[in-house]
């Protein structure tokens, strides 16, 4: 007889933060999964939720500036609200979340905010079909150069406020699968501050943004002076671009935009 209940491993929202000496803010450079817990490791912390069927053991190695973690099951589920899960992990360089299941998640806001040194993050397996909030998800992740979110399902998202704000080194952004029909807030979605690094050249989409429910889109491209639409359209002062520029560039038909159609 089969068991109708599938056992699972679920991590605490602030699990990794609770392990590092400065709660992630100033020390952790790497977060790595291992196959076992070494016998000589001290200060092992459990970072699973109360409802998790399996333990997740984690510890911090000061010599390697690394959080190591171990769990029996391959797949680790995230809880529904992971607001700020890696918020202010300012020294974190890379992160592989390919074994994490995000199918229950509704809130991804501030997930990587102020991950200043983060250069790459693998989100290829992320299930975002239930997510409603992506506010400031990558804000100030300023070393990421390329970000491919073409697998993201955004049908239920209502808040994209400052989602990619101040990603200084971002050169290309692929959001070709984005569905924005329910989004109400896109304030400073792609913007940056005056006087900071400006690298963003292309934003790839499959279709114009659906802005039928959009309420607020203040300065979505502020200070993005290198950004060009697919046919070269731009404004001398990107701050003047309003929500009508959230579309594929089509100047021949009087419809300039800051997006490039993905070929």
Residue ranges and their predicted role:
Residues 1-263:
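Negatively charged
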């Amino acid at each position: 007889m089969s068991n109708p209940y599938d056992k699972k491993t679920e991590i605490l929202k602030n699990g990794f933060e609770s392990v590092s000496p400065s709660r992630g803010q100033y020390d952790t450079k790497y977060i790595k999964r291992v196959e076992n817990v070494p016998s000589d490791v001290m200060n092992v912390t459990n970072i699973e939720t109360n409802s998790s069927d399996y333990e997740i053991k984690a510890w911090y190695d000061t010599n390697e500036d690394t959080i190591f973690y171990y769990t029996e099951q391959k797949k680790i589920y995230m809880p529904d609200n992971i607001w700020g899960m890696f918020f202010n992990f300012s020294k974190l360089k890379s992160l592989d979340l390919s074994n994490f299941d995000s199918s229950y998640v509704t809130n991804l806001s501030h997930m990587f905010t102020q991950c200043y040194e983060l250069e790459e993050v693998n989100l290829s397996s992320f299930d975002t079909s239930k997510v409603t909030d992506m506010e400031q998800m990558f804000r100030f992740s300023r070393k990421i150069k390329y970000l491919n979110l073409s697998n993201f399902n955004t049908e239920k998202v209502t808040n994209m406020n400052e989602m990619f704000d101040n990603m200084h080194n971002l050169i290309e952004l692929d959001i070709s699968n984005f569905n924005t029909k329910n989004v109400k807030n896109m304030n400073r979605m792609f913007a940056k501050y005056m006087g900071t690094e400006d690298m963003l050249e292309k934003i790839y989409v499959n279709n114009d943004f659906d802005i039928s429910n959009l309420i607020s889109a203040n300065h979505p491209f502020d200070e993005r002076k290198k950004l060009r639409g697919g046919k070269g359209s731009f404004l001398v002062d990107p701050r003047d671009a309003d929500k009508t520029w959230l579309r594929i560039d089509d100047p021949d038909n009087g419809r300039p935009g800051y997006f490039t159609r993905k070929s």
